[in-house]
From Swiss-Prot:
The gene is bioF. Substrate binds at residues 21, 133, 352. PROSITE patterns: AA_TRANSFER_CLASS_2. Its cofactor is pyridoxal 5'-phosphate. Signal peptide: none annotated. CDD domains: KBL_like. Belongs to the class-II pyridoxal-phosphate-dependent aminotransferase family. BioF subfamily. This is 8-amino-7-oxononanoate synthase. One of its GO terms (molecular function) is 8-amino-7-oxononanoate synthase activity. Coiled coil: none annotated. It comes from Salmonella paratyphi B (strain ATCC BAA-1250 / SPB7). Pathway: Cofactor biosynthesis; biotin biosynthesis. Keywords: Biotin biosynthesis, Pyridoxal phosphate, Transferase.
Amino acid sequence: MSWQQRVDDALTARRATDTLRRRYVVSQGAGRWLVANGRQYLNFSSNDYLGLSQHPQIIRAWQQAATRFGVGSGGSGHISGYSVAHQALEEELAQWLGYPRALLFISGFAANQAVITALMKKNDRIVADRLSHASLLEAANLSPAQLRRFIHNDTQHLSRLLQSPSVGQQLVVTEGVYSMDGDSAPLAEIQHIARRHHAWLLVDDAHGIGVTGDEGRGTCWLRGVKPELLVVTFGKGFGVSGAAVLCSESVADYLLQFARHLVYSTSMPPAQAQALSASLAVIRSDEGGERREKLAALVQRFRAGVNASRFTLLNAHSAIQPLIVGDNSRALRLAEALRQQGCWATAIRPPTVPVGTARLRLTLTQAHEACDIDRLLEVLHGAGE
């Protein structure tokens, strides 16, 4: 088989099963409204949960820092790219979340990959929730460690896997809020089981940080859990981009030596770090609390209004509200029907989610108003298929 044949066959297979991904060009993709092709849509696809991507205080912080530092960091943090803005943000995050250290990464994908590939060795075992993010599972598969996956949120299955003999160390991997189902992990029980088996716990709280818990400290804080490795990302609740790993002093020093994604990548722009500090200040303020309260009320309004006879609504109380429709083509038709009525929603299909669970992944944000939720419900219940 030639290279071209391999490429063509893979694309043909995706088209045949209605799983071919595509990008949409938008003029505005975050906030209450999405603008594409000159038309305005109510935006139910953005991860900008607190509406901070448009916050004037955060925008101003980025602009002022760009004037001071320029638009790029100029190199890896090990060379010349670790600025006072990066240092300040790391210290603020560590203090906020109660960890000795925080290390910044250019993305959540990079942070997850870096931690797992740096820590895990031959004869080690990774025990991950089967619905863990692709960045976590790919890193586990690429590492020399053995990967075992437990049934989603099934702590008994997790315990059985950890009980089986292992020569090396064990790492339990889970998420705070799951990106496709919108539900939360039983973190307290998972941590208890991990400690009983002398395993470390890694929690990716990409969709919980900033949005839940006291001062927005996330799912782990809310559940009274402190994993050895906490990954937080900044493209959701923070409204910007990037990520950080919270850990002990010694683990931070270890990652600075052996995490190749950190050592060999250009640091995020200092202006981005300063904007993230401004975002953190908003998240921790009374305004941040008000934004979280409004979002929670909108989620409750949506869940109360969905017609359960037409859609399968998962037990999710986060900003992520998936409607399971099952068939790939039906999910695509429903997303298109919503767009025709002015609501932008995304159809999620395999391999992102299991076969037979294609869905509309609806995300609600603080930028929405109650009337927007009512309009979404009206369109959903009137959508012809």
